[in-house]
Amino acid sequence: MEFVAERAQPVGQTIQQQNVNTYGQGVLQPHHDLQQRQQQQQQRQHQQLLTSQLPQKSLVSKGKYTLHDFQIMRTLGTGSFGRVHLVRSVHNGRYYAIKVLKKQQVVKMKQVEHTNDERRMLKLVEHPFLIRMWGTFQDARNIFMVMDYIEGGELFSLLRKSQRFPNPVAKFYAAEVILALEYLHAHNIIYRDLKPENILLDRNGHIKITDFGFAKEVQTVTWTLCGTPDYIAPEVITTKPYNKSVDWWSLGVLIYEMLAGYTPFYDTTPMKTYEKILQGKVVYPPYFHPDVVDLLSKLITADLTRRIGNLQSGSRDIKAHPWFSEVVWERLLAKDIETPYEPPITSGIGDTSLFDQYPEEQLDYGIQGDDPYAEYFQDF
């Protein structure tokens, strides 16, 4: 669904400014230094105090809400169908993000199925690197999705500010994305819209994949043309039946973009981009490590019999690739790995400094009465 927060400019340090070009030897290995361990334990204790004010599964029950349960603080992003707001619960004081979609626009743009799929997918998933939805509700004009508020902003913003990431940094984010996609695919969910704009960073610098507007539960194959042009696999463009392998193509494009600062098939119009994708010619900058060139050549390939992730061993082939040889996957999943970048969150819980300011407008929320679109959104 083309509903993402506008591209914010991050405030404060970038990847280069934090000197994490040296974030290399053992970057994805667990920590061993005792003093560093003790410092991190103190930081974790402090973080536990902070996160006691954040949504926790054991403290906050998922369910049905109404607009009266929240105080709208400010707009975090705008899109074709509505807005994303930072809100605060009037019951527990915790902060959430509420995604609001205008029913009329969703129906007009023929996005009803995608919108219902998004609700269904978010209700199903629970993973450290995926956004969490707490509940939904609706009024006569809008539908509302209550989700975690992730303060660190978009990976897109950090990438544009940094221009491109050093090899180990791109590897870190790619590895967390792989674990998230692996989980989705194990539940027969294709994500179909992987891009930096849909990857948020939490306050510690770990990823959260958001915006499930194109996600779909698929047992075998599907045919729908959807996604963002630069990241779409060739089989989607040619309207051939496709499966989870399209996400691994997009992963390859994402890794390329993180390392180069631009996508491999970029052009001035979607049609020209599609032409380049179908031609399949990828030019690798000379500073790309040979291992990542080998990996990308096996991800960004139209030949599904060669695209790793789509072969008999599935995602294990990607995780076993030499480019990921340093990764301790179990530690990464447990978030027991140092992150290359911690967002400069200065105002504590509810900080919005990493999101752009938007003019606030009169909101038509909470209106009751006749609902001509009720039949389309019965599950909300």
Curated annotation (Swiss-Prot):
InterPro entries the record matches: AGC-kinase_C, Kinase-like_dom_sf, Prot_kinase_dom, Protein_kinase_ATP_BS, Ser/Thr_kinase_AS
Protein origin, superkingdom: Eukaryota
Positions of post-translational Phosphothreonine modification: 224
Cellular component GO terms held in the UniProt record: cAMP-dependent protein kinase complex; chromatin; cytosol; nucleus; P-body
Matching Pfam families: Pkinase (PF00069)
Other facts noted in the record for this chain: Present with 2220 molecules/cell in log phase SD medium.
Family: Belongs to the protein kinase superfamily. AGC Ser/Thr protein kinase family. cAMP subfamily.
Name the UniProt record assigns to this protein: cAMP-dependent protein kinase type 2
Organism of derivation: Saccharomyces cerevisiae (strain ATCC 204508 / S288c) (Baker's yeast)
Upper classification of the organism: Eukaryota, Fungi, Dikarya, Ascomycota, Saccharomycotina
Gene that this sequence comes from: TPK2
